[in-house]
Amino acid sequence: MTRDEVLAEFRAAGALLEGHFILSSGLRSGVFLQKARVFSEPERTERLCKALAAKVRAELGDAPTVIVSPATGGIVPGYEMARQMGLKGLYVERENGEFTLRRGFELTKDDKVLVVEDIVSTGLSSRECIEAINKTGATVIAEACLVDRSGGEADVGVPLIALTEYKVPAYPADQLPPELEAIPAIKPGSRGLA
């Protein structure tokens, strides 16, 4: 899928929003990708994840043995990527503010993990997810995401395979451009949810 095709899927789902948004990282942006709207449509989600799975296979072959995603945003694409790749799909979730495997999920030292995220902006959630996986003894070999908002600048600590890059400016709250200062901010992301 091309960048335009990926963004067309987001637009068609009403998921490419404009306004003043507080991102999960705390940065502010005039554009927000509301992936929940994309993921509410199974066929659209399947198309995007099928294309991402093909890209992952082209770069990694059959190296991954398990998919792990961070809750909450990564659960749906993680599940669909696991389905597309014929792998088990697990997720980490926050407990006392830190990602951990729960619900009886386990990894072994032999597991070669592909982390699957929805959108990568700064890479913070990715790094936290990878840290939790590393504590299990498993090896994270790469991360895959639908959209890399950083334009390739985010450092997640492992190779990042993005279906597309979509560089969107993001600003600290005290360095907003005038057009964002004039609009009330909303926080549509999931960081901080219980």
UniProtKB/Swiss-Prot annotation:
Recorded catalytic reaction(s): these are: orotidine 5'-phosphate + diphosphate = orotate + 5-phospho-alpha-D-ribose 1-diphosphate
Give residues annotated as binding orotate. Answer: S121, R149
GO terms of biological process kind: 'de novo' UMP biosynthetic process; pyrimidine nucleobase biosynthetic process
Binding positions for 5-phospho-alpha-D-ribose 1-diphosphate? E117, D118, I119, V120, S121, T122, G123, L124, S125
Signal peptide (UniProt feature, chain positions): none
In terms of domain of life, where is this protein from?
Bacteria
Cite the annotated pathway.
Pyrimidine metabolism; UMP biosynthesis via de novo pathway; UMP from orotate: step 1/2
One MF term from GO for this chain? magnesium ion binding
- Give the enzyme's EC designation: 2.4.2.10
**Which coenzymes or cofactors are required?**
Mg(2+)
Keyword vocabulary terms for this entry: Glycosyltransferase, Magnesium, Pyrimidine biosynthesis, Transferase
Subunit annotation: Homodimer.
The record's comment on protein family reads: Belongs to the purine/pyrimidine phosphoribosyltransferase family. PyrE subfamily.
Q: Report the PANTHER family cross-referenced here.
A: OROTATE PHOSPHORIBOSYLTRANSFERASE, URIDINE 5'-MONOPHOSPHATE SYNTHASE
User: What name is this protein filed under?
Assistant: Orotate phosphoribosyltransferase
